[in-house]
């Protein structure tokens, strides 16, 4: 599928080339103009929110997850343009606890606060939803540790 998309992009790119291989600022009308409308992006299936959440919860709930996989998962999750659901964060915090990685728990909570951005109501909601887990695992929030004042 990727090969076909790359071929379409190559065809679209050659449609702009003139007789000497130079790029022209405006295409000439004709059959090549139809090729121009091809967009070069993936047409793969999209993942529902429930599938996305289940995939991340399953990954963090792996009993044999190691520190590298945990950090890789956290880094990947942070790159998305979203604030993870509390159930995903819960699974990540439990994975941190299984690995005795307190620093990652603080990093996760700081990342959630950062991802919430100007929406001040999101972070308190997430902490409220995670409060039972935080108490059960003995995890302090960055605010409780005084890290928000640094």
From Swiss-Prot:
Example GO BP: mitochondrial electron transport, cytochrome c to oxygen
Residue numbers bearing the N6-acetyllysine modification: 87, 113
InterPro entries: Cyt_c_oxidase_su5A/6, Cyt_c_oxidase_su5A/6_sf
Targeting presequence: 1-41
Keywords from the UniProt entry: Acetylation, Heme, Iron, Membrane, Metal-binding, Mitochondrion, Mitochondrion inner membrane, Phosphoprotein, Transit peptide, Ubl conjugation
Gene Ontology MF term list: metal ion binding
Recorded family membership: Belongs to the cytochrome c oxidase subunit 5A family.
Protein task: Component of the cytochrome c oxidase, the last enzyme in the mitochondrial electron transport chain which drives oxidative phosphorylation. The respiratory chain contains 3 multisubunit complexes succinate dehydrogenase (complex II, CII), ubiquinol-cytochrome c oxidoreductase (cytochrome b-c1 complex, complex III, CIII) and cytochrome c oxidase (complex IV, CIV), that cooperate to transfer electrons derived from NADH and succinate to molecular oxygen, creating an electrochemical gradient over the inner membrane that drives transmembrane transport and the ATP synthase.
Protein name: Cytochrome c oxidase subunit 5A, mitochondrial
Primary localisation category: mitochondrion
Residues recorded as bearing Phosphothreonine in the entry: 141
PTM annotation, UniProt: In response to mitochondrial stress, the precursor protein is ubiquitinated by the SIFI complex in the cytoplasm before mitochondrial import, leading to its degradation. Within the SIFI complex, UBR4 initiates ubiquitin chain that are further elongated or branched by KCMF1.
Any Pfam family the entry gives: COX5A
Subunit structure, interactors included: Component of the cytochrome c oxidase (complex IV, CIV), a multisubunit enzyme composed of 14 subunits. The complex is composed of a catalytic core of 3 subunits MT-CO1, MT-CO2 and MT-CO3, encoded in the mitochondrial DNA, and 11 supernumerary subunits COX4I, COX5A, COX5B, COX6A, COX6B, COX6C, COX7A, COX7B, COX7C, COX8 and NDUFA4, which are encoded in the nuclear genome.
Chain positions of motif SIFI-degron: 2-17
GO terms under cellular component: mitochondrial inner membrane; respiratory chain complex IV
Topology term for the membrane: Peripheral membrane protein
